[in-house]
Amino acid sequence: MSDDKSKALAAALAQIEKSFGKGAIMKMDGSQQEENLEVISTGSLGLDLALGVGGLPRGRIVEIFGPESSGKTTLCLEAVAQCQKNGGVCAFVDAEHAFDPVYARKLGVKVEELYLSQPDTGEQALEICDTLVRSGGIDMVVVDSVAALVPKAEIEGDMGDSHVGLQARLMSQALRKLTGHIKKTNTLVVFINQIRMKIGVMFGSPETTTGGNALKFYSSVRLDIRRTGSIKKGEEVLGNETRVKVIKNKVAPPFRQAEFDILYGEGISWEGELIDIGVKNDIINKSGAWYSYNGAKIGQGKDNVRVWLKENPEVADEIDAKIRALNGVEMHITEGTQDETDGERPEE
């Protein structure tokens, strides 16, 4: 670059920094880039691997959508539990007014340390979310759900009144404000969304999500969660078989998927995933009905091995670490905002 151009650029950069503050513009020479993307585990080992970076990326917007009773809130609460386990501070904006503290505690959430808001209107919910993010003191915010973010005009109006596009405009405006603050404060914001059917669709999927298109564009990760079957013991139903597809991913290759079990009253069966993925990666050996690790038998039948891993969390953590290292998705936790932990999974 010529001297004249260099001087002109230096003057422009100085003017920008004077007007908008230091760091408003920077050269990507590597010194300003973070070596590793910071993530928060989803609580599902398989999904962490499918995401390609070991969890949900911080400083980004994530959308989780699916049919009713598919495990959307359960997945979010599992992620909240993982964030708290590593010293993170979490907030739950419950627009549906359906938060169950007893169930959350069973999933490992420290309910007494969770900030809960049950707003009256969509505007109030999103303003609370923005204020929490701008504070810089929150690591993760969950909004449950976009469909329940009802605009004030609709609440104050009469039944049957037409309010076309109100919610979509509300979401679009809020996300324009939120995005910059989320990146600056390195906060993870998760929006839970519901599925609706488009009328008159002849070709392609008739399914769509609520709240317009803004969330689809602003989200760095979009997860489609579905219940694929039931887990039974005789006639008793113990849980759901669940599949999550990574529909959009700006931080790793998309279109991967993960399958795991959600057990009623326990949440995601982490030990079950360890067994399945451990066998697939040749970390756990399976011979007939017997499973062995490091040459020692650990149980006959998957259910017995799951119980053994629960009783031996240090071995379970060791297998988890080996699987993550083998797949190149070791998690990177922010220093300073999160306390050191012993690495144990919350009790279920």
Swiss-Prot record:
<keyword id="KW-0547">Nucleotide-binding</keyword>
<dbReference type="InterPro" id="IPR003593">
    <property type="entry name" value="AAA+_ATPase"/>
</dbReference>
<dbReference type="InterPro" id="IPR020587">
    <property type="entry name" value="RecA_monomer-monomer_interface"/>
</dbReference>
<dbReference type="InterPro" id="IPR049428">
    <property type="entry name" value="RecA-like_N"/>
</dbReference>
<dbReference type="GO" id="GO:0140664">
    <property type="term" value="F:ATP-dependent DNA damage sensor activity"/>
</dbReference>
<dbReference type="InterPro" id="IPR020584">
    <property type="entry name" value="DNA_recomb/repair_RecA_CS"/>
</dbReference>
<dbReference type="GO" id="GO:0003697">
    <property type="term" value="F:single-stranded DNA binding"/>
</dbReference>
<protein>
    <recommendedName>
        <fullName>Protein RecA</fullName>
    </recommendedName>
</protein>
<comment type="similarity">
    <text>Belongs to the RecA family.</text>
</comment>
<dbReference type="GO" id="GO:0003684">
    <property type="term" value="F:damaged DNA binding"/>
</dbReference>
<keyword id="KW-0234">DNA repair</keyword>
<dbReference type="Pfam" id="PF21096">
    <property type="entry name" value="RecA_C"/>
</dbReference>
<dbReference type="GO" id="GO:0005829">
    <property type="term" value="C:cytosol"/>
</dbReference>
<comment type="function">
    <text>Can catalyze the hydrolysis of ATP in the presence of single-stranded DNA, the ATP-dependent uptake of single-stranded DNA by duplex DNA, and the ATP-dependent hybridization of homologous single-stranded DNAs. It interacts with LexA causing its activation and leading to its autocatalytic cleavage.</text>
</comment>
<dbReference type="InterPro" id="IPR013765">
    <property type="entry name" value="DNA_recomb/repair_RecA"/>
</dbReference>
<dbReference type="GO" id="GO:0016887">
    <property type="term" value="F:ATP hydrolysis activity"/>
</dbReference>
<dbReference type="GO" id="GO:0005524">
    <property type="term" value="F:ATP binding"/>
</dbReference>
<keyword id="KW-0238">DNA-binding</keyword>
<dbReference type="Pfam" id="PF00154">
    <property type="entry name" value="RecA"/>
</dbReference>
<dbReference type="InterPro" id="IPR020588">
    <property type="entry name" value="RecA_ATP-bd"/>
</dbReference>
<dbReference type="InterPro" id="IPR027417">
    <property type="entry name" value="P-loop_NTPase"/>
</dbReference>
<keyword id="KW-0742">SOS response</keyword>
<keyword id="KW-0233">DNA recombination</keyword>
<keyword id="KW-0067">ATP-binding</keyword>
<keyword id="KW-0227">DNA damage</keyword>
<feature type="binding site">
    <location>
        <begin position="66"/>
        <end position="73"/>
    </location>
    <ligand>
        <name>ATP</name>
    </ligand>
</feature>
<dbReference type="GO" id="GO:0009432">
    <property type="term" value="P:SOS response"/>
</dbReference>
<dbReference type="InterPro" id="IPR023400">
    <property type="entry name" value="RecA_C_sf"/>
</dbReference>
<keyword id="KW-0963">Cytoplasm</keyword>
<dbReference type="GO" id="GO:0006310">
    <property type="term" value="P:DNA recombination"/>
</dbReference>
<dbReference type="InterPro" id="IPR049261">
    <property type="entry name" value="RecA-like_C"/>
</dbReference>
<dbReference type="GO" id="GO:0006281">
    <property type="term" value="P:DNA repair"/>
</dbReference>
